[in-house]
Amino acid sequence: TAITEAQTKAQADYMAANLKKFGWEYIVVDIQWYEPGAKDHGYRPDAVLMMDGFGRLQPAVNRFPSSADGKGFKGLSDYIHGLGLKFGIHLMRGIPRQAVDKNLPVKGTIYHARDIANKNSVCPWNPDMYGVDMTKPGAQDYYNSVFDLIAAWGVDFVKVDDIARPYHEHEKEIEAIRRAIDRAGRPIVLSLSPGENVLDAADHVAKHANMWRISDDFWDRWLAVHDQFARLKNWNPYRQPGAWPDADMLPFGVLDQGKRTTRLTPDEQHTVMTLWSIARSPLMHGGDLTKTDDFTRSLLTNADVLAVNQNSLNNRPLFDHDELIAWTADVPDSEDKYLAVFNARDRVRLAAEHARYASPLVTRASDSKAAIDVDVSDASRMFLVLDPTGDGVAWDYGVWLAPRFVFADGSERPLTDYQWTRTDAI
């Protein structure tokens, strides 16, 4: 939320030098670029926003100095285009509340901001905007003026936020934005956010947007990765050229303005990159490119995997056997197939036949003790598996069983006294 022009140029320089040849091409400035006092990960109800006299947002000059004197993003856009890349921005749905408070005119019309604002349509998490009432005269003109300005800046990509949910309430504004882009005279990729979009809107969103989020913000947690398997499967029938279900950014490398590195393990990062590619989700890197490590670079420059994302055909789920999941796709101009196989299970599965010893069944209805006599002197790891075979309840077995070691000298030690690497419920 607080990125600057200098930081944006640094990202673009890295992409041009290291990633462009692998197909990476968009540099996108995210939310709050119009707020001089923006802070990381926060929105302020009383924030002063930069606007022109027609209620159209402008870059904050203190953060984007090339925007001075009403130049907007043209200077930054020209810089990025000069590197052979494309430039994008984030945009909140609607019209700035400040424009409504000042009742600024809608460019080229007799109408004003208060004539078109819907004060009952507000974002639940960002206080900057009111929705636009598309039944009012001047409403389409306002969106036309916004995208005329954006096109004049040389913008190639716009992510419109607070518009994809609740989807049906915002359909008219989505249609208005599509019309505004189509008449602006410049090809602009339209991305809609946030998810989770509803499947019954699939035909509408594919007609009006080039990509749309299928989830809320995706961050670096395994549970978030796991949930994307089902979402990408559900949206797969609606993917088509020029219309892409978007599983969100790749949270790799250094994140949060350099404050931390990704929490995903290397295997989990491989899973994300592979799933996004075989499902042909748009690829947007969310980390600081200038701090890219060798492993992250290897993910972003794997030409074989990127070819699947960019060029494969007929991508589809193949099977899901107890969360052992496979996707396949056709290789263009070939009878060959791509195959991606994932272990999406949350927990380690232990095969009983590999156990050195399995105790008798112990339940509330059986004897309360079971003696286990097994030599573990050469073992380096121990797994205690509590199986709910007896009565269907597993979560409290470790409590009431109170398992313990009994040593040769007769002394005892509860297993709970030992340091365990991890615990999972079955």
Locate each region found by the language model.
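Gly-Asp-aromatic-enriched flexible segments
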Residues: 349-426
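Carbohydrate-binding surface patches
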Residues: 270, 276-279, 284-286, 320-350
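Solvent-exposed loop/turn segments at secondary-structure junctions
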Residues: 1, 31-36, 93-97, 162-167, ...
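Glycan-recognition surfaces
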Residues: 115-121, 134-135, 141, 145, ...
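Structural recognition of the beta-strand scaffold that forms the well-ordered cores
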Residues: 23-30, 35, 86-91, 151, ...
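Extracytoplasmic, non-cytosolic globular domains
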Residues: 146-196
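Aromatic-lined carbohydrate-binding/catalytic grooves of carbohydrate-active enzymes
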Residues: 15-157, 162-167
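Catalytic cores of secreted or luminal carbohydrate-active enzymes
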Residues: 271-320
